[in-house]
Amino acid sequence: MSSKSPARIAAMFATVAAFATTAMTPMIATAQPMQDAQAVVAPAPHVRLTTPWTDEALKAPVPFPEYPRPQLVRTEWLNLNGQWDYWGGKGAPDARLAPGSAPRFPEKTERVRVPYPVESMLSGVERLGEVNLWYRRGFEIPAAWKGRRVRINFGAVDRLATIYVNGTRVGQHEGGYTSFGFDITPLLKPGRNELVVAAFDPSTNDGTLGKQSLKPGGIFYTPSSGIWQTVWLEPVGQAHIAKLDMTPVVGEQRLALTVRAGETKGLQVEAVALKDGQVVGRVRGAADKALSLPVPQPRLWSPDDPFLYDLKVTLRRDGKVVDQVDSYFGMRSIEVGMVDGVPRPLLNGRFVFQFGPLDQGFWPDGLYTAPTDAALRFDLEETKKLGFNMVRKHIKVEPARWFHYADKLGLLVWQDMPQAWDAETDLAVRAKTEVEWREIVDQLRSETSIVTWVIFNESWGDFEHRRMAAQFRAMDPTRLINAHSGINFAPHDEGGGDLIDLHDYPGPAAPTYQPWRIAVLGEYGGNSLKVPGHMYRPESKCCYHLFDSAAAINDAYVAQVDKLRGFRADKGLSAAIYTETTDVEEELNGFFTYDRRVKKLDFDRVSKVNKALIDGR
């Protein structure tokens, strides 16, 4: 638990429940959920909202049939999503123990729909507080894969996952936001094989959990435990491409590329960049070595022109092809520069005002998991239609396909780090959190759309801001660092990173820029409107200012953006984030209702004022 007492936490939630109509106070901002593992219970009473994609998800024999890894695509793979056996609740074994052999499942088991969290409606389980989660399914290896290695891949499992094949432990992974996989070839047999996944997820403060809470309410939401992204098998060679690290170097008209292959002896790499199907650059070299792929006269990626180059990478040994993958990349730069004496974020050498919504990434039917791939894309498409050019992904890491759509649609992304509350005071939790954050940065470093890493939010589980800013800079010197979003909720500002970030509800307000730090408004707005029939909890009034009509909330939104236009011109404000894309459980702040069925604001009117702010008109 955090150093903050349960009594103080309860008082903070009482304050949140009052839904203040003035600027948010530090007391609200530092409120945290009480996170003690508890008995298995049904989710708190609420309306079981469906989305336009719920029926499709329920009927799909294999949910999310799309290839899950757009920047490392292989043509052969086997999707393991769908119905699995499930064993959870009080009788399930402790998944932390991870014995060498999988336990015997009961004769009668429940069924769970993968990859939806067990707390979600779409999973078919829909229970809260199941700490030990055991999954089982059978599979057969296609005959065409004979003679090759077989890897099993997981998009994400929250929080500690142990994998078994045919009863034998394969490996373990900790961290609910990063992908992982194992070579399972030695354990396979002809015909039917058995896969068991054990997940331990107490949803407690000693691990990264974002805005999940065992006692959801106000600005914290229902947890998402266990498997919540796609599971799949793929055949590979003994030597194969494991990862591509790509960094555009616009000033030198090249892509810095490293092809991770693990085994490197005798391996040669060829990478080819294509523009509209035509080869524009080629490089050959060794695996696991830094390569420079020419991209002459690059067409630069931006929200106005989100152009992406195709990339084909081939791995050879003694002239023979041993692996080949398809990928893509965008050419863009992001840096801090002075414009008329004001520090500004420069995209491709030009100041672009960054404006977008706070995006929580929750769904009433799937929680952390969107019901379908089309739904995953929908939120970003609508963000673009609203005239925004960026999105702040709030304290959650999305599947790779979400970033793929941000890349394709042209949305700048601020990526938050999921916090662990206890990292503030517990050094062991802090060390584990830092490891997970390094894995997140490493996993996402090739995504074109990500321009800013956000380390801490409103002092939640925070520690050593300046050191962490330096650490993120060392991990990735090519992006902007926001060491602490909402510095007005911290005891003090250590001055790290590239941004000085204020939160103001309903606002807006602007911080004073510094010679080395850009002034941004990391959160504001939170304008609320009830839409009967589309509310997760009909009695909710959350949060910050509740309007009584669509006309009133639209007028308030436009007035707030007009103020931002003045702050851009007079106070050097360079970015702003409005809360939020959609309603989330008790929160009623969205452009859409939580079920994505009702637009709460006038999108045409919003788009016009948003574009005027971005364009400086």
Where are these regions (language model features)?
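Beta-strand-rich binding/interaction modules
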Residues: 165, 253-285
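N-terminal carbohydrate-binding accessory modules
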Residues: 244-246, 312-383, 612
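Surface beta-strand/loop "capping" patches
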Residues: 235-264, 344, 614-617
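Substrate-binding/catalytic cleft of secreted carbohydrate-active enzymes
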Residues: 380-381, 390-605, 609
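Accessory beta-strand-rich segments of carbohydrate-active enzymes
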Residues: 87-89, 125-126, 130-240, 264, ...
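Extended carbohydrate-recognition surfaces in non-catalytic/accessory domains of CAZymes
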Residues: 36-153, 208-220, 224-227, 236-237, ...
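Bacterial N-terminal signal peptides
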Residues: 11-26
